[in-house]
Amino acid sequence: NVLAGLKSAIVAYSGGVDSSYLMDVANQTLGSKSLAVMSFSPSVAEDDRNDAINLAKNKNWNYKIINTLEMDDENYVKNDINRCFFCKHELYGQLVELSNQLGFDWVLNGSNLDDKGDYRPGMNAAKLHKVRSPLIEAEFTKEDIRYYAKKRNLRSWDRPASPCLSSRLPY
């Protein structure tokens, strides 16, 4: 268990299967030293936000909601091929700041081994902010995560990918 060596962690939590599974394991491993942080912005569908909040409440996770301001970044708004970098840069910047304020040691995301094969500029933002990807470290694929999420009775185990609303617009 990659998380066993951590003292505390903030999980970038969207309510999708990857971050839900990661948060569930973090909660089991770190207890009150884990915090799910959800980002609210115009890029996130309201149904996705509500589902994420409901899951966090039902699982009794510590959670916090922040508002990200990627829409204020002209680099994001111009909608080029690196749009996701600027969104994740905003998110991870806020999460690192929050972790420093609250005394958490790490910021984690739910990236998995399958994500490494895709074009993911957001992974560069994670690297820049020293965000860890424990599911990659543990060599978990999406299929692995769905399997273990189902065993943990996470409602999101078979949820289809739900990328942000901005990703539905071509570059």
At which residue positions do the language-model features occur?
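ATP-dependent adenylation/nucleotidyltransferase module used to activate substrates
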Residues: 1-151
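Mid-to-C-terminal catalytic subdomains of enzymes
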Residues: 139-171
